Amino acid sequence: MHMQRYSSAAIMNLHRSFLARQTPIMKTKMVNPFIESKKACDVFINHRGIDTKRTIATLLYDHLSWLNLQPFLDNKNMKPGDKLFDNIDNAIRNCKIGITVFSPNYCKSYFCLHELALFMESKKKVIPIFCDIKPSELRVVNNGNVPLKDLERFNLALEEAKYTVGLTFNSSKGNLSDVVKNASEIVIESLIEMESEQKMIKSSRNTPMAL
């Protein structure tokens, strides 16, 4: 399955349309990521650090920031002394969209799977990027240290993510800038769609019922 693709001109129009909805202060202020980590973010980037932090995850964060969006990446938005689970869980519950970068060592991380499960439990839209791994290869690793309740959460979340249309990237053949650009375009499209849906819901609630 393939995601709907837009021309570059259409994407630029979508981006301008999205920014036009933001307040002037949002578009011009200098952002302190440590302060913004306490607030709602547009996009939470879920990834395995040893695989993708120095590549696709950081490039995504930088590109989304350049687009005047508010992404969340643990090493960018958190500082020494912050409580890990409190900050991560709060950011996920308050984000608008999640990007999950699946990679060969992803399923070995309790934190990665916890974040993914929280996405699904919070009913967030998740954009999967399968980096050097196929969806069919993703399996929860049970080393005996994970509580049964969490194993069930992780398996359910992983199965849902595996059957969600996403992007694929092969680091030996692909171009990082292409997958970053494509993922960013999907984020913008999704944010605009979500905003339109929210406006329709709000409008319907404010419309008086005919007698």
PLM ranges: what are they?
Residues H2-I97, E121-K124, N182-L211:
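Conserved N-terminal substructure of TIR/SEFIR domains
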Residues S65-W66, N77, F85-N182:
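Cross-kingdom TIR/SEFIR domain
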